[in-house]
UniProtKB/Swiss-Prot annotation:
Chain residues that bind Ca(2+): 43, 45, 47, 64
Name of the featured protein: Basic phospholipase A2 chain HDP-1P
Residues at the active site: 63, 105
Function recorded in the entry: Heterodimer: shows the same activities as the monomer, but with a lower potency. Monomer: snake venom phospholipase A2 (PLA2) that shows presynaptic neurotoxicity, anticoagulant activity and that weakly inhibits ADP-induced platelet aggregation. Inhibits exocytosis in pancreatic beta cells, confirming it can act presynaptically in inhibiting the exocytosis of neurotransmitters in neurons. PLA2 catalyzes the calcium-dependent hydrolysis of the 2-acyl groups in 3-sn-phosphoglycerides.
GO biological process, one term: phospholipid metabolic process
Organism, as annotated: Vipera nikolskii (Nikolsky's adder)
Family statement: Belongs to the phospholipase A2 family. Group II subfamily. D49 sub-subfamily.
Top-level EC class as recorded in UniProt: hydrolase
Reactions that this protein is recorded to catalyse: a 1,2-diacyl-sn-glycero-3-phosphocholine + H2O = a 1-acyl-sn-glycero-3-phosphocholine + a fatty acid + H(+)
Lineage: Eukaryota, Metazoa, Chordata, Craniata, Vertebrata
The enzyme's E.C. designation: 3.1.1.4
Activity regulation text: Enzymatic activity and neurotoxicity are inhibited by Triton X-100, which has been determined to be located in the center of the hydrophobic channel of the enzyme.
Length: 138
């Protein structure tokens, strides 16, 4: 019960893009799927280093690179327009950086969906000591 309360408090404080990204992931993969990607491999979650462990981890690497190219707003906080149409994520009428962030998130959510078969439970909560190789360039 205490853990549920902590999770609820954390989610109440989540605004903007990261919450929208989570909703995209859940929309493509099913309710609560986002929890599978919060700390996975070397790149899913905060930060990232080393070589992606599999195609799922590479989705996060590419997403990190995409966020790194966004200029003009904070990708983790900005709120953009999007919707689901027939199971597809459609970015709305966003301008500039909001459009770019939405596209980063849309591509990553689709990538997770397309690479579900590579998901390896052994990479969930992977120790950072297993991600010490030289990081790839974006």
């Amino acid at each position: 019960m205490r853990i549920l309360w902590i999770v609820a408090v954390c989610l109440i404080g989540v605004e903007g893009n990261l919450f929208q990204f989570a909703k995209m992931i859940n929309g493509k993969l099913g309710a609560f799927s986002v929890w599978n990607y919060i700390s996975y491999g070397c790149y899913c979650g905060w930060g990232g280093q080393g070589t992606p462990k599999d195609a799922t981890d590479r989705c996060c690497f590419v997403h990190d690179c995409c966020y790194g190219r966004v200029r003009g707003c904070n990708p983790k906080l900005a709120i953009y327009a999007y919707s689901f149409k027939k199971g597809n994520i459609v970015c709305g009428k966003n301008n500039g950086c909001l459009r770019d962030i939405c596209e980063c998130d849309r591509v990553a959510a689709n990538c997770f969906h397309q690479n579900q078969n590579t998901y390896n439970k052994n990479y969930k909560f992977l120790s950072s000591s297993r991600c010490r190789q030289t990081s790839e360039q974006c």
